[in-house]
Amino acid sequence: MPTTFHEIPRKRPTTPLLDRAQTPDGLRRLGEAELETLADELRLELLYTVGQTGGHFGAGLGVIELTIALHYVFDTPDDRLVWDVGHQAYPHKILTGRREQMASLRQKDGLAAFPRRSESEYDTFGVGHSSTSISAALGMAIAARLQNSERKAIAVIGDGALTAGMAFEALNHAPEVDANMLVILNDNDMSISRNVGGLSNYLAKILSSRTYASMREGSKKVLSRLPGAWEIARRTEEYAKGMLVPGTLFEELGWNYIGPIDGHDLPTLIATLRNMRDLKGPQFLHVVTKKGKGFAPAEVDPIGYHAITKLEPLDAPAAAPKKAGGPKYSGVFGEWLCDMAAADPRLVGITPAMKEGSDLVAFSERFPLRYFDVAIAEQHAVTLAAGMACEGAKPVVAIYSTFLQRGYDQLIHDVAVQNLDVLFAIDRAGLVGEDGPTHAGSFDLSYLRCIPGMLVMTPSDENELRMMLSTGHLYNGPAAVRYPRGTGPNAPIDKSLEPIEIGKGVIRRQGRQVALLVFGVQLAEALQVAEKLDATVVDMRFVKPLDEALVREIASSHELLVTIEENAIMGGAGGAVSEYLARENILKPILHLGLPDAYVEHAKPAQMLAECGLDEAGIEASVRQRLALLGLA
């Protein structure tokens, strides 16, 4: 097994057992004694695959044995296996007939980064966001009962995803309907358990066995006839188990808790799953795994090896130096956050488990008492910020656009209705690339601009981002700044913390006939197009409040208005312009460019923008086509 990053195989390894186990049917034809070797081969294959394509890395390495055991014991796809989030699903894809397609992973027209129902019958539920698996599996279990089917429903959820309220809502509901389902907690952070070893594994086998289950149910029937006896016995059992296993919470919710067991011990996994397969009612199995298992660098640094980029062949020529680009937008935010926190002691930073991705590491180290990572709990993050704002704090919620969708009710009910001073720093706005539609920030302008009192800003470069963050921080009420993944155009940055005038756009180029009204980072492309068309370019900056005076001025002096945004056209910033013109009875041809009424599939960001007509060529072609239609070409 490779021990360094550079030892990851560039050529497909020899895997005789995996060659025979390319589907679950083939896997089940292997003997149990062969499965340990299969696990080694699958782990090596995963290293090779992700090295070829890039992608999620550590999570898959941690569930090799669990994935094998699940497909070995259960009759997938008839038994429904639901993976939470999907970061760990690459081994599942390899074992379910997609090994030869893995080279297309996360590429245009290739395999998706996450399980998708349209991709395979083994992908029973599409995922990408966390904490949905238990609810989905519960729905499947109830449907099976209504259909008089004996098929099983299994949810695999990580300890991080289990922190979300949605997961506990499902855990609370399943015992109420006595669902025949299995939840597997993949605990790869030791965040819940410490009792892992021989005793726990032994207990798991005993507690999950049919004999134990039969004795338990028989005792319940006998003792239920004696007043108070069953309750005493139940409490005695609970206390005895509680001394050895950490499952009291799940037992209290009504689950039959088994574990924790070693998630890399295949014989124990298989024996326990076989026992639990035929048990009725809600079953909960706690397995402990190590993220990055089998690859030392990933075991030591699971965060750094959560995902990797594509490896170049060892004999590849030296890559051409990359063009100098600007800093990452998230980095500009992180620096601003520290600067503003030093200047304003009221500032607090909140993130739902995105410290690294949103660049809050430096802030968390410099201002630990003002930094709050609430885990995967977007609803809580928003209302926590609201509560802080009620007491005079100035919260900044750093959150990805796609995840803010999960806290939308709180955004309206708890923040906006009360006009509280909460700034939302919305990262990953627009198209994000290889992770596909589940992670795209396609809708934030649409769902934000309809909220009364909301300040909504779209920077065109790094400097505007910094200025808009200051503007939102000083604003009396809820504010949002949305910015994309990746780097800016290397604009000079004003390090001051001064705001800009609210609701005012800026004309960046004066032209004639055509006016390009840009909301966000497509400004650079618009300026290039404008040089060819002699068009006016307006950096609109604010979606709400819209610079209506500037729109009126531009409409009066141009024959065609073109709005450009990396957001859904429906309900987006362009719609705000059209609504204003209609309200003022201003008749003017207008073309809206943005994201279509469709989910843009995974590809490289440049490919996705081209597909949507938001690259330079696409913008130019659309404008020329409309000019021709209007007889203005």
Curated annotation (Swiss-Prot):
Keywords, in A-Z order: Isoprene biosynthesis, Magnesium, Metal-binding, Thiamine biosynthesis, Thiamine pyrophosphate, Transferase
Recorded GO CC terms: cytosol
HAMAP family, per database record: DXP_synth (MF_00315)
InterPro entries hit by this protein: Dxylulose-5-P_synthase, THDP-binding, Transketo_C/PFOR_II, Transketolase-like_Pyr-bd, Transketolase_BS, Transketolase_C
UniProt-annotated stretches for the region Disordered: 1-22
Molecular-function GO terms, alphabetical: 1-deoxy-D-xylulose-5-phosphate synthase activity; magnesium ion binding; thiamine pyrophosphate binding
One BP annotation, GO: terpenoid biosynthetic process
Free-text function comment from the UniProt entry: Catalyzes the acyloin condensation reaction between C atoms 2 and 3 of pyruvate and glyceraldehyde 3-phosphate to yield 1-deoxy-D-xylulose-5-phosphate (DXP).
SUPFAM superfamilies the UniProt entry points to: Thiamin diphosphate-binding fold (THDP-binding), TK C-terminal domain-like
Residue sites binding thiamine diphosphate per the record: 87, 128-130, 160-161, 188, 295, 378
Binding locations of Mg(2+): 159, 188
Cofactor: Mg(2+); thiamine diphosphate
Catalytic activity annotation: D-glyceraldehyde 3-phosphate + pyruvate + H(+) = 1-deoxy-D-xylulose 5-phosphate + CO2
UniProt name for this protein: 1-deoxy-D-xylulose-5-phosphate synthase
Pathway: Metabolic intermediate biosynthesis; 1-deoxy-D-xylulose 5-phosphate biosynthesis; 1-deoxy-D-xylulose 5-phosphate from D-glyceraldehyde 3-phosphate and pyruvate: step 1/1
